[in-house]
Amino acid sequence: MKPDHPEHPAPPDGPARKAVAPVICYPVDGLPRPDLVAYRSARDGWTLETEVLVPPREARCFTVPAGWFFRIVSVDGPQVGDLNLFAADNLGERFFSGKTRALHGTHLSTGDRMWSCLPYLRPMATVTEDTLDWYGFDAFGGSVHDVIGTRCDPYTHALLSGGDQYHHCCHSNLTRAVADHWGLPAKAAELHVHDVLNVFMCTGFTRDTGQYFMKASPVRPGDYLEFMAEIDLLGALSACPGGDCSAEHSSDLAACHPLLVQVFKPPAPPVGWAPSGPNPYDRSHGHE
């Protein structure tokens, strides 16, 4: 973090440099926007095809065909979930939280998309409903459904705790779920686990030090975050050991609850919709 007492004095024009107005890195005016009216209309008459209950401090995989919908639902009590997404037939194409953040901001809500990694960079899923959209940003700068945290993991925990071995961090939970789904050894599956969408987690950055903070999630039973799959998806969801993340994670101390994944089949895809195609960049990189 930035020092309270810098070692180097500001130059004479320092205040002028700091006063330069910022610009948005990735203006999204030219980005194709989802037709939310068509997406939501496609839900009429849908059928619930699959339910997957994710136990506390565990993770489970689920599949969603392109054009179908899925919800992550709070069922028994406030609970945060860590979500990984993959192309169903290619573990190498996975959610890219950094680019999603650059395009849509630190926290996602209705109309935002989860984008896949390079060289694919295409929409994987679109948020179609968010029952916590009322929360906005609070007085601390916190909001829900962030793409700034990475996921709790046993490596960071071991460093911070003097070597404690905890096996139910979200990273480990997701590793086990991916390993079981694909029949991979844990060390091979782990390489595919990636930075997450922190579903229901309330987070931000402190204004004085710029540190990542968490606070009690406002989620309550019945709340959900809903998506439409833009491609055939494999999802992996961990019910975080931090519970509502009001105090700590990476231990068994917090009260934890299950999360429910529901997968819905619409009668027909949204009008005018087609699955995400390949990114239009030719991948030549200027190399002869």
PLM region descriptions:
Residues 1-288:
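Acidic, Ser/Thr/Pro
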